[in-house]
Structure formats: C-alpha cells, structure tokens
Swiss-Prot record:
Family: Belongs to the COQ7 family.
Keyword Kinase attached: no
Species of provenance: Xanthomonas oryzae pv. oryzae (strain KACC10331 / KXO85)
InterPro entries: COQ7_proteobact (IPR047809), Ferritin-like (IPR012347), Ferritin-like_SF (IPR009078), Ubq_synth_Coq7 (IPR011566)
GO BP annotations listed: ubiquinone biosynthetic process
Chief location category: membrane
Identification of the protein by name: 3-demethoxyubiquinol 3-hydroxylase
Binding annotation for Fe cation 2: E96, E148, E180, H183
Length: 217
C-alpha cells in the first residue's frame, strides 16, 4: 500500500517555510557534516600557486555539484507521492550535506571560495527536481540514478587531474564517489525508470556548462 508523503500533511505555508530554510542553509549557510571529514587524518602538503588554483577550481565544481544535488533532491522530495520515496530522497540529501561541508572545508583550506552563482545553481536544480517528481516517483528516481552516474564520472575525471600531492582533496572525493554510487544503486532498487535518451544527453550538456563556469566563478 502506498503511504502518503509526510509533506502533504503540512499546510502550504509550512512547506514553503521548510523549503525556504533548506535553500538558505544550502546556499548561504554552513550546514555541518554528520560524518567526520575523510581528509581529517591526511597531511596537508603545500601546493604551488598553480596547483592550488587548479585544485580550488575542481573543488568548487564539486561544491556546486553538491548544491545542485541538494536542490534536486529537495525539489523531488517536496512533491514525492510516496513516503518511502521521500525518505530515500531526504536520506540521500543528508549525505550530500556531508559532501557539501567537506568541499567547503577544502575550499577554505585552499584559500578559495564557493561559486558566486550558487543561488542560481540551486534554484535551477530545485525546479528540475520538482518537475521530475511531478511526473511520478519512478521518474524522480530515474533522475537520481542518472545524476549520480554522471557525478561518478566527473569525480573520476577530477581524481585523474588533481595534483598528485593533493591527497586531502583526493580523500574527500573517494568517499563522495562511493556514496554517489550507492545512491544510484538504491534508486534503481527502489524502482527508478530508465530515462529516455535525450534527457541524459541534455543533463550532460548542462553539467558541462556548470563545470566550465564554476571552475572560475
């Protein structure tokens, strides 16, 4: 029997306030991680200016990716029809909050900053998540699978191109990659729909644009 999503038991104003707070926390706040930073015990070896600039650009991309993931998952969860689906999305979002905090910490260590366009990234991802969720929970889960698979691929790219001595960034990205793969597997097991071919392609193009811009801004 399908269970009603808990969000549907709250008033529209309650739901609006919850979503607004989530957006503010993600974009402007500094939400704490529930798990220890994977780089905590890894030596912070000094990078030269070019290595530091490149590492910061990559970690800014990863931070934006987590902002987008939060927007996507919260948008999907807001319109989820089934309580189990909503729980899955919010649980994944919590792990993405850990990633967000770890990437923010590493950016600070690299004397850099998050993307100036984070409000735009979040808003666009939230809208996409809500639209996907309105098509049905299977569509919503399908977007989770495709998103996480594409994130896995760009994490692999970053692990290849990070400076060899930047082991702190590498430690963070390795754990993130494990988490993303698990999120995709869990979404598939929960009944994700395979998305029509044009959608993954469009998502890949949007991701490429985001990475190009976020590396600098």
């Amino acid at each position: 029997m399908t269970q009603t999503s808990p969000s549907r038991l709250h008033s529209p104003l309650d739901r609006l306030l919850v979503e607004a707070q989530r957006a503010l926390d993600t974009v402007f706040g500094n939400p704490p991680a529930e798990r220890p930073n994977p780089a905590a015990d890894t030596p912070d070896i000094a990078l030269d200016p070019e290595q530091r600039r490149h590492a910061a650009g990559l970690m800014r991309i990863n931070h934006v990716g987590e902002v987008c993931a939060q927007g996507l998952y919260f948008g999907q969860a807001a319109v989820a029809r089934d309580a189990h689906t909503q729980h899955h999305l919010l649980e994944a979002a919590q792990e993405e909050t850990d990633h967000l905090a770890w990437c923010a910490d590493r950016l600070h260590e690299l004397d850099s900053r998050p993307s100036l366009l984070n409000p735009l990234w979040y808003a666009g991802s939230y809208a996409l998540g809500a639209l996907a969720g309105l098509r049905g929970d299977d569509w919503s889960l399908g977007f989770v699978v495709e998103t996480e698979r594409q994130v896995e691929a760009h994490l692999d790219e970053h692990l290849e191109t990070l400076p060899d001595i930047d082991q702190r960034s590498r430690a963070i990205l390795r754990v993130m990659k494990i988490d993303e793969a698990r999120h995709a597997d869990q979404a598939e097991q929960a009944g994700a729909r395979q998305l029509p071919a044009p959608i993954p392609g469009a998502m890949a193009l949007a991701s490429k644009l985001m990475k190009t811009v976020a590396y600098r801004l």
